């Protein structure tokens, strides 16, 4: 678009439907272009081109289409895509879903203005995810180890304490090593006012805000803003990582609300729906978010992602968790059964998995016994869980002494490893020591996954 076209104001709005506006008689317009809109009473609004064909543009209005009409509304196409002004000074600040200050502080003086959609990374320019990120949560650090540059979602359900876990991770997360800079970018989408107050209070009172950038999109904010929020958050994270050399953990919650916004916009455009009414391009759209995690050759910083989503009806085969699982490198699953028992965080380690855990475990990263002792504990816990079903049928009296020891181990594992205080920050060494303590419950001959050398070095003497 040339300079002359940027000055043209169109009044050829032909149709307004929901958050969308159709403009006729235009030319030289591109997909994703930002639009300045003047309402009949002179107010300014912003929109984005969702579709451009022949002489027609379909524009999504960020602030909604109330008070707009087809005869007096003026539209100007800017020729620019959606951009966010980024700066190191964003650390310690809270913004709304569109990147405007929400904490009463001044506007950010941008060091750079970046396209919120990011830029495609050549796969050859990526380094494999590597090195340990400590969250202070045993069920993540021990069994589902998080690695710098990884993307691993948390699959939750309505009413489960994923918000509490998200703030705990944001507060406690750190990278090990001298001189390493670490930051958290936290983006909440489609949340209630109560949840917003909870997040802001938690970040402020615990001091976590000092190393964090927070973006909050409320449930009553426009759907298009919900689409922008994670992109703005990831653009901020990429700037801090690749321009400032920081290791950045991005927490996105709740991706289910994001996907509902995708469905709402697709329905307004009369698109042919895919599975359960979601647009057919939802897989591609989610991949555009998740694939922005990683490590880049020649850059010091990294971007690590923990997207959180609530599974509708606790259905892990629902399109949102299903498609997410194809793109990401594992999953952390919260259990309603454990939550009913009063276990916090209610992480069920059996269906949970970190496919890159091995890249962050071992000597020089965590400890030399990490992978072996966790493998032993995982196997013992799985056997103990299976024995619970048997006990429900035949009773505990029918079990052998060996079986009873595994049953006891499973109970102890849930009570001392899985269960953890919301303010309890465990180092990886503490987590592994707790696991070794529990292994004393089992007969020595059952410790088949750890070497004699590791047993002599770490297993407490009875």
From Swiss-Prot:
<keyword id="KW-1003">Cell membrane</keyword>
<dbReference type="InterPro" id="IPR000194">
    <property type="entry name" value="ATPase_F1/V1/A1_a/bsu_nucl-bd"/>
</dbReference>
<dbReference type="Pfam" id="PF02874">
    <property type="entry name" value="ATP-synt_ab_N"/>
</dbReference>
<dbReference type="GO" id="GO:0046933">
    <property type="term" value="F:proton-transporting ATP synthase activity, rotational mechanism"/>
</dbReference>
<dbReference type="InterPro" id="IPR022879">
    <property type="entry name" value="V-ATPase_su_B/beta"/>
</dbReference>
<protein>
    <recommendedName>
        <fullName>A-type ATP synthase subunit B</fullName>
    </recommendedName>
</protein>
<keyword id="KW-0472">Membrane</keyword>
<keyword id="KW-0375">Hydrogen ion transport</keyword>
<keyword id="KW-0406">Ion transport</keyword>
<dbReference type="GO" id="GO:0042777">
    <property type="term" value="P:proton motive force-driven plasma membrane ATP synthesis"/>
</dbReference>
<dbReference type="InterPro" id="IPR004100">
    <property type="entry name" value="ATPase_F1/V1/A1_a/bsu_N"/>
</dbReference>
<dbReference type="Pfam" id="PF22919">
    <property type="entry name" value="ATP-synt_VA_C"/>
</dbReference>
<comment type="subunit">
    <text>Has multiple subunits with at least A(3), B(3), C, D, E, F, H, I and proteolipid K(x).</text>
</comment>
<dbReference type="GO" id="GO:0005524">
    <property type="term" value="F:ATP binding"/>
</dbReference>
<keyword id="KW-0813">Transport</keyword>
<comment type="similarity">
    <text>Belongs to the ATPase alpha/beta chains family.</text>
</comment>
<comment type="function">
    <text>Component of the A-type ATP synthase that produces ATP from ADP in the presence of a proton gradient across the membrane. The B chain is a regulatory subunit.</text>
</comment>
<keyword id="KW-0066">ATP synthesis</keyword>
<dbReference type="InterPro" id="IPR020003">
    <property type="entry name" value="ATPase_a/bsu_AS"/>
</dbReference>
<dbReference type="Pfam" id="PF00006">
    <property type="entry name" value="ATP-synt_ab"/>
</dbReference>
<dbReference type="InterPro" id="IPR027417">
    <property type="entry name" value="P-loop_NTPase"/>
</dbReference>
<dbReference type="GO" id="GO:0005886">
    <property type="term" value="C:plasma membrane"/>
</dbReference>
<dbReference type="InterPro" id="IPR055190">
    <property type="entry name" value="ATP-synt_VA_C"/>
</dbReference>
